[in-house]
Structure formats: structure tokens, C-alpha cells
Amino acid sequence: MSSYVANSFYKQSPNIPAYNMQTCGNYGSASEVQASRYCYGGLDLSITFPPPAPSNSLHGVDMAANPRAHPDRPACSAAAAPGHALGRDEAAPLNPGMYSQKAARPALEERAKSSGEIKEEQAQTGQPAGLSQPPAPPQIYPWMTKLHMSHETDGKRSRTSYTRYQTLELEKEFHFNRYLTRRRRIEIANNLCLNERQIKIWFQNRRMKWKKDSKMKSKEAL
């Protein structure tokens, strides 16, 4: 039966010229291969090769004009933070390092210096206004100042001269009290702007003068 099928196939198929293999310089090119026609049972089994498309690559692999070999591939991303990815067009925030911190410190110091200079200028401008109105000195009367102060350094005591007001007040006190207590001496010294020693000496001299005058009066009476 196999021989019958083979004979029937041989009779129905037309004479086909032998296929001649040609040597081609470029194996990737299919245009140089001749088309062949085959028939089986009245069916056309011819093989046709489409014209090749322009290619920029070797070994029949097409490459687009775009330098990116894989256009569908997503852009490279950089992890800016955990769980967040940045694209190529996005700029990842830079972490300021030691050099950036050092560069920022001089700017802060300059701002602090400038603010300090401004405050000093304001203080200087405010001073003349305060100096234009000096506080009035307290009024001091003559008996409030300590007079007859010795400034000599030779060891000799200078003779104390009392004012009329001081002499009058001391005479009044001597008329009532010929001997003063220490507490009373301090009060008189403060009132007359004298020291305790000056009051004590004045009363000693005044008592001696009073005794001398009393003796002379007693002699005249005899």
C-alpha cells in the first residue's frame, strides 16, 4: 500500500526544478534565497520570504535609534529613604556633611557679629541723650561740710578755727552743760559737721577759760 501512495503522489506533483543552494555572504539575509513551490494533493505549499527590515545590529537583531537597549525597562532609581524610590529625573536630597556644616558656621558667626555691632551702635547713640541731662547734685550748706580738716603730714596739729555758727551752738551747749557725755558729743558733732575729738578739745579749752575768769573775779572782789 505504501508503494501505491508513493506512486500517486509522484504522479500528481508536477516537475519541480532542483533546488540550488547558493552560497550567501550574509547568512542573516533571506532575500537571496530563491522561493520554492511545493504541491501536495492539489494544494500549493510554496514558501515565500518577506523582505528584510533595515537593521542596525548584527546577527539579525534589531536595534532602535534610541541608545537605550530596553525601552520598557524602568528607569534606575535611588533609594532616598526606606520604602521610597526616586526616579532618574528626581533629585535625591543630599545629607549635609561635615564640610557643609563648617561652611554654615561662618555665616552664623557673621550674622551674630553684625547684630552685636548694631546693638553697640544703638547703645552709643543713646548715650549722648542721657549725658545731655546730668542729674542735679544735692544741695550742701556750709555747716554740713566738714571744715578745718588737717592735711599736714609733718606731725604737727593745725589750729582749728570754728565758724560763727559752730561757736554760737557750742557756747549754748556749754552754758547748760559744762561736761558732756560721749553720746551727747556724737550728736553735736553730727549736727555741726565736726568730729568727736574737736568737740572734746573745745569743751576742755572752754572750761579752762571759765576757771581762769572765775579766779580773776574772786581776786577783784577781795
From Swiss-Prot:
PROSITE patterns, alphabetized? ANTENNAPEDIA, HOMEOBOX_1, HOMEOBOX_2
Q: Give the UniProt entry's GO cellular component terms.
A: cell junction; nucleoplasm
**GO biological process terms held by the UniProt record:** anterior/posterior pattern specification; embryonic skeletal system development
Mind listing where the DNA-binding region sits, in residue ranges?
155-214
Instruction: Specify where the region named Disordered lies, as residue ranges.
Output: 68-141
CDD domains (alphabetical): homeodomain (cd00086)
Motif Antp-type hexapeptide: chain residues: 140-145
Composition bias type Low complexity, residue spans: 74-85
Tell me which UniProt keywords the record has, alphabetically: Developmental protein, DNA-binding, Homeobox, Nucleus, Transcription, Transcription regulation
The record's listing under InterPro entries reads: Antp_homeobox_Deformed_sf (IPR050609), HD (IPR001356), HD_metazoa (IPR020479), Homeobox_antennapedia (IPR017995), Homeobox_Antennapedia_CS (IPR001827), Homeobox_CS (IPR017970), Homeodomain-like_sf (IPR009057)
The molecular function GO annotations come to: DNA binding; DNA-binding transcription factor activity, RNA polymerase II-specific
Quote the SMART domains the UniProt record gives. HOX
Question: Which spans does this entry mark as compositional bias, Basic and acidic residues?
Answer: 107-122
**Entry-linked SUPFAM superfamilies:** Homeodomain-like (SSF46689)
Domain of life assignment:
Eukaryota
Where does the record say this protein resides?
Nucleus
Record's function text: Sequence-specific transcription factor which is part of a developmental regulatory system that provides cells with specific positional identities on the anterior-posterior axis.
Its family remark reads: Belongs to the Antp homeobox family.
Provide the protein name: Homeobox protein Hox-C5
Species of origin: Mus musculus
Task: List the lineage, top down.
Answer: Eukaryota, Metazoa, Chordata, Craniata, Vertebrata
